[in-house]
Structure formats: C-alpha cells, structure tokens
C-alpha cells in the first residue's frame, strides 16, 4: 500500500512553481576535474599498480558472478543494452516486495552518442554501476533514471509519487545528460525520483540537470529521500524531496529545500544562514568519512574490489582531489557467495579469512555470520538480502576486529524473533580500541538497510545494536514496514494486525563511544526508534517517522505515563552528543487521536547539542514539543507545516 502524502501544502506550492520553470533551467557543465594529487606516502591510489598509461582497457577476464549480474561492454549496440535493461526494469518497476535482485555493470568505455544516447530506467532491487577505477572510465551519453510510480490505490487520484521508490542505486560513472528522443519535460534533466535506500555515489553528472523529483507526471509528485555522496553535478533540483543528505560532493547550484536538506563537506553547498526560511544545514567538512568499496576492472583486465581509506575533516569528492587511496583486493581474496549457499558455507569462509562478495539474491541465514578478523570486507551486489531464519542475528562483528567494512547489504527480520539483526560487539577488557589509528573506524556501514516486515512477517527486538566504539554509519535505513504483502486486515490498512505481528521494539541502540553517522534513517519502531547511550556521538542528518500503527494511545504510552516515545533519545547520563539536521514525523494512521510528548528527548547538558531539528504532522496524530519541552505542537490542524528549533539548548 502507498505511504501517505507528506507535507502536502508546502510541497504542492514547490511542485507547481517548479513545473513552470524547471524545463527552462539551462544545462550547466562543471569544468574539468582538478588534477589528482599524488597519494600520500604508504598509500595506493586506486588501480595504481596495474593501470596502463593509456585510457584503453583490454578485455576483462571472464568472471562468473551469477545469473543476476549483467555485464555490458561498450562494443554492444545501444539498442541491445536498452532492450536488456528495459526488460529488467519492466519486471522490477512495481516489484517492491519481490525476491528478485539485479546488478547491471558497465565495463570501462563510452556508451551512446549525441545522436543515439543510451537511456535506461532503474527499478526495485537494481544496482547500476561502472566498472572503472574512476567515474570517468565509464561514460554514458544519455540517462540513468528513476521516475514516479502512479499508484491506483493512492489516497487521491491521480497519485503519482516517488514515496515508495526504495532499494536501488547508481554509482561510479559519468552521465553526459542527453534527452534526445524524449519529450520536452523528460529531456530537461536526468531524473532520480527515489526515496530511502536509493544511494547515488561516485557519479559525475554533466551537461544537464540532476532532478531528485519527477515533475513530468501527474501529481502530487512527492519524494522522500535520500543520499548523494562522493559525486559531482551542476544544477540539482531538489523539488519535493522532503529531506536529503549530500556528503563530500561538488555542486554548482541547489534549487530549494523542503524540511531538512543537509550538506557535509560539499563544495558549492548553499548557506544555512537563513534557516528555517531556507531549510539548509551545512557543515564545511565531514568529520570522518569512508567511501563504499566497489568492483572495478584494472588495466590488465582483472576484477578487483577497491576498499577506500578513511578520511578526516574532508571536503569534496575523493576522486577529484587525489584522495581516493586504499586497498585493491583481488576477487580471489573473496568468497563469491550465491543465494543458494547455506549460511554455514559463508560463515566458514569468514572463519578462513576470506572476504565476502554477496552476489544478487536473497540468502536464508540460520546462524550468525561472525566477523572476527580485522579489515574484513562484506560487499553486497544488487541489494543482496540476508533473511534471519530461526531468530538468528545474521551479522555479528566481534569486538577484537577493526577496520571492518559492511556495504550494500539488506538484512530482513524473519518470522522467528531475533534479538537483533546486526550486533557490533564491544571489545572485551578495558580501554578503547581502534587498531588502525584514530582515522579508521572499527566498523563502517555503507548503504546497509534493515527491514522488519513488508515481503513477509518479521520480528526482532532491536534491529541494530552498536556496542563497539568508533563505528561509522554512512547511510543506513532501518525500517519497520508500514505496508507490505503479509495479508494483514484488522485496523487501518491492516495496522492492528501489523502492530501485533510485525514486532520491532527498538530500531537502533548505540552504546559505543565516538560513533558517527552520516545519513541515519530510522522508522516506525514500537518504542524508541533510536537510543544513543554512548559518549561523543556525532550525527549528520537524522530522519524518523513514528509508527503509523499503534491501535490506541494506551499502546503508545510509556509505563511511567509519558505519552509515546520520542523518535530520537539521547541517554540520560550522556555528557556529549551532537546532531545536525534532524526530523521526526508523525502519521498515526490507525488512531489519529494519538499524542506523542516530544520528537527528541535529550539530557539538558552543555555538551549535548542539537542543531536544526524539527517535527511535522502528516495528517494524523500530534507531537507536543520538538525537543523536551521546547518547540511548538504539530497536529492535523496544519499538516505539513514543521515546527523548528534552530539550536538546543539555545545559545
């Protein structure tokens, strides 16, 4: 079922204005990339050892990554590539709860021409990625796009939105935007009209606009993303995107904000000086970042995985400033997993010191995949999904491991109650541990998604438990499903059944110190969505919706009588914590009379600081305050109108 309209009043104004002017926006091309600096001593620039002096690439060594990995070569006719991509898109465009997973990979080369551009669309559970060492190694003259879906069961008709456009990605390529053959509106931008779990990474958008909404369909055209990192673009049209994080990128211009547009380490980011009139939150640098690992083909035709180093106080894309250093791992260092392999095979490979490359598909995991060795990489392709079986915790990272990277993986709760879906354990003994120096996180999570319910019944006590220190979260979505195909009937949209069956008490618990997050999205859990007990937490963009489905106020009241649970809770004993750009939304669909006391709850201490936070009503339910007892009430008398707190505590 569709998610409800969000922010209807302000978004309609924005959409109407954009529809009139956006096609007139002049395509803007950024200048050439800055010359890359030499890598620091002891560091290896990506592909350095094997890249030839010329830009020519020999044929890639044959690599079998399974039937759901499609590899394109620039010698293939554009029509053939489009036909194959279209057949996958037509299968996946409405397949929100399906088990199909796809990875579309492009070998180094140039695809499409000015007269005959390559134009493809991206559906659910589909990854589109270049196989070059640099985004400039794969050039698409054309488009890679996501459009609105026009839903026949929406609350109004027509109902064309991107609110449910989840679980897809594009990375590591250059797009020379070319709309030849499309109508005037469609030709005006490369559209990426997606919501959560739809990352854009390591892309270079040239010669045209990048639009994060689809303004070419009928209305209401809502979107609720989103994440862009390590990328470069000219004009970016935010449009109806309610919230968005842009990290370590370069932009020429940004059209507008809605509720919570956040920028960290981004060249050309808009100023936050007029907040909340302009809803921008801008940090000049990113405190700690580590880019997502990716597959590439080196100069000899060998397939490798590049694992980037961490950066501190960084700004701009690593590939434009000579900072794309790291390790290049051969595929022989990985266990290349298939969905039909039992969990014991994957666990055994980890125990033998192998990294894991999860090819596209859904994996049944009846025992924990335990990571004990430092520097282990678990990389998923095509939204690879691990489903908990028998109440398992699919991934556990032992406390002694450091430098671990888990990326591109979705973890589903199963029908048996899990204690957690991922557990990052604390180091045993006394003291703190980094193992690689102060800049390398103990574990990094890039594009890791958690799901409770949706395609099937799911149950977990907590989705993600972080007991380790020095963890880096870089774009995760932790989602207890507000809709699905489980067959629920009781309550609004089956919500009473959903509340009683798809149990997820807590979304994220952070007990470790110095845990950092760039892009933390947590939604619909039955008590706390996020509880942060560790010291020196640092969060850049937090997005939360409270659960839609409590049957009554009694179900949404704490034992001490407090009305509801805040969407973001900092532990009472915490001395130091920072949050930049946060939003908590309420849509109590099952009982619109439900009230929540506050969106954010934090201890009143000088070291605990929230910067640019808000609450908003989405037509049902109310929140009395934004932070503790500060900030105006939001309710259905003014749906879509946020209540902002610029700084808490006030300066």
Predicted regions span which residues?
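Extracellular/periplasmic carbohydrate-active domains that bind, remodel
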Residues: 21, 33-651
């Amino acid at each position: 079922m569709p998610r409800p309209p969000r922010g209807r009043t302000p978004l309609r104004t924005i959409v109407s204005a954009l529809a009139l002017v956006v096609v007139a926006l002049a395509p803007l091309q950024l200048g050439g990339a800055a010359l890359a600096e030499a890598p620091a001593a002891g560091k290896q620039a990506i592909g350095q050892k094997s890249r030839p002096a010329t830009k020519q690439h020999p044929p890639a060594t044959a690599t079998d990554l399974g039937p759901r990995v499609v590899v394109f070569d620039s010698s293939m006719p554009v029509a053939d590539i489009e036909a194959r991509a279209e057949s996958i898109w037509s299968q996946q465009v409405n397949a929100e709860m399906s088990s199909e997973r796809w990875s579309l990979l492009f070998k180094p080369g140039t695809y499409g021409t000015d007269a005959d551009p390559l134009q493809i669309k991206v559906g659910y559970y589909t990854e589109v990625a270049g196989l070059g060492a640099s985004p400039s190694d794969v050039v698409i003259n054309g488009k890679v796009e996501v459009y609105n879906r026009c839903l026949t069961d929406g609350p109004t008709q027509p109902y064309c939105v991107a609110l449910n456009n989840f679980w897809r990605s594009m990375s590591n390529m250059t797009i020379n935007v070319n709309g030849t053959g499309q109508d005037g509106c469609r030709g005006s931008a490369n559209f990426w009209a997606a919501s959560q779990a739809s990352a854009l990474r390591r892309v270079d958008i040239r010669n045209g606009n990048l639009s994060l909404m689809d303004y070419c369909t009928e209305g209401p055209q809502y979107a609720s993303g989103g994440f862009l990192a390590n990328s470069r673009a000219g004009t970016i049209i935010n449009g109806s995107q309610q919230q968005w994080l842009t990290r370590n990128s370069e932009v020429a211009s940004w059209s507008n904000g809605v509720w919570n547009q956040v920028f960290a380490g981004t060249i050309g980011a808009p100023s936050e000086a007029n907040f909340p009139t302009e809803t921008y939150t801008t940090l000049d640098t990113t405190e700690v970042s580590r880019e997502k690992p990716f597959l590439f083909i080196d100069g000899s035709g060998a397939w490798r995985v590049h694992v980037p180093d961490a950066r501190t106080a960084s700004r701009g894309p690593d590939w434009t400033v000579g900072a794309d250093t790291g390790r290049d791992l051969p595929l022989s260092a990985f266990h290349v997993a298939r969905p039909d392999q039992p969990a014991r095979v994957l666990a055994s490979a980890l125990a033998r010191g192998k990294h894991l490359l999860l090819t596209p598909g859904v994996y049944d995991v009846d025992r924990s995949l335990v990571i004990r060795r430092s520097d282990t990489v678990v990389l998923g392709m095509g939204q690879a999904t691990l489903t908990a079986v028998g109440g398992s915790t699919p991934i556990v990272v032992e406390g002694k491991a450091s430098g671990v990277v888990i990326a591109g993986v979705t973890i589903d709760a199963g029908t048996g109650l899990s204690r957690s879906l991922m557990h990052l354990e604390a180091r045993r003994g006394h003291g703190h541990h980094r193992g690689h120096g102060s800049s390398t996180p103990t574990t990094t999570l890039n594009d890791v998604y958690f799901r409770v319910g949706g395609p099937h019944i799911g149950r977990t006590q907590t989705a993600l438990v972080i007991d380790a220190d020095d963890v880096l979260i870089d774009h995760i979505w932790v989602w207890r499903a507000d809709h699905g195909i489980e067959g629920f009937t009781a309550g609004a949209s089956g919500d009473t059944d959903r509340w009683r069956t798809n149990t997820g008490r807590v979304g994220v618990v952070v007990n470790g110190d110095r845990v950092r997050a760039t892009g933390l999205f947590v939604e619909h859990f039955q008590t706390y969505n996020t509880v942060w007990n560790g010291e020196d937490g640092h969060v850049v963009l937090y997005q939360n919706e409270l659960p839609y489905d409590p049957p009554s106020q009694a179900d949404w009241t704490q034992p001490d009588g407090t009305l509801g649970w805040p969407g973001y809770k900092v532990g009472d004993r915490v001395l130091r914590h920072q949050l930049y750009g946060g939003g908590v939304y309420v849509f109590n669909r099952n009982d619109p009379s439900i009230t929540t006391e506050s969106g954010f709850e934090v201890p009143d201490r000088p070291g605990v600081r929230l910067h640019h936070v808000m609450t908003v009503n989405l037509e049902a339910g109310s929140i009395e305050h934004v932070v503790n007892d500060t900030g105006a009430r939001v309710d259905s008398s003014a749906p879509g109108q946020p209540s902002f707190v610029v700084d808490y505590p006030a300066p």
